[in-house]
Regions:
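Short alpha-helical DNA-recognition segment
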Residues: 2-23
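Residue-level detection of the helix-turn-helix DNA-binding "recognition helix"
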Residues: 26-28
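DNA major-groove recognition helix of helix-turn-helix/homeodomain DNA-binding modules
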Residues: 34-51
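Generic structural signal for well-ordered, non-transmembrane alpha-helical segments
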Residues: 38, 79, 83-91, 115-129
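Short, charged recognition helix plus adjacent turn
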Residues: 51-84, 139-142
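Acidic, glycine-anchored loop motifs typical of Ca2+
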Residues: 69-76, 88-113
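Extended, charged low-complexity alpha-helical coiled-coils and adjacent intrinsically disordered tails
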Residues: 108-142
Length: 142
């Protein structure tokens, strides 16, 4: 997009003033409107901006595992995800989860295992989300 080659053109495409865009870029504006973050991510083909907003600015998103706003290489991200999906790890998590939930009650002694499972799932969510961001960026020509 040729408009994105200048701050004025980008500001016009975003529907903000050039000075507002400069304030966003320089961190002067403390709360960037979420609709502008979404629009910037789409215009700049930078889905990682959405991840950054959710992990850094959104009070709800801060409490959930989110992909990093700093994208690694596709190779590194894929290997990280595949490492977490090793068959023996998945089987162990599956067996523990069955044991914990089979009776419909989570006892005190099962809580440690459940916390480990939740941490494992958080890592999986984060790795899958990072690969998704890289894929979205690649599919949109980035």
């Amino acid at each position: 997009n040729d408009k994105l080659s200048s701050r004025e053109g980008a500001a016009e495409a975003l529907g903000v003033s050039a000075s507002s865009l400069a304030d966003y870029e320089l961190g002067i504006t403390k709360v960037i409107p979420v609709d502008k973050v979404v629009l910037m991510a789409d215009l700049y083909n930078a889905p990682e901006l959405k991840a950054w907003y959710c992990t850094s600015e959104c009070p709800i998103g801060k409490s959930f595992p989110m992909p990093s706003s700093e994208l690694s290489s596709v190779e590194r991200t894929t290997l990280n995800l595949l490492r977490q999906l090793r068959q023996e790890d998945v089987e162990e998590v599956k067996e523990k989860l069955i044991d914990i939930t089979a009776d419909g009650v989570i006892s005190e002694d099962e809580r440690v295992d459940l916390q480990q499972i939740l941490s494992y799932l958080d890592g999986l969510i984060k790795a899958a989300g990072e690969l998704r961001l890289i894929g979205l960026k690649a599919m949109n020509g980035g």
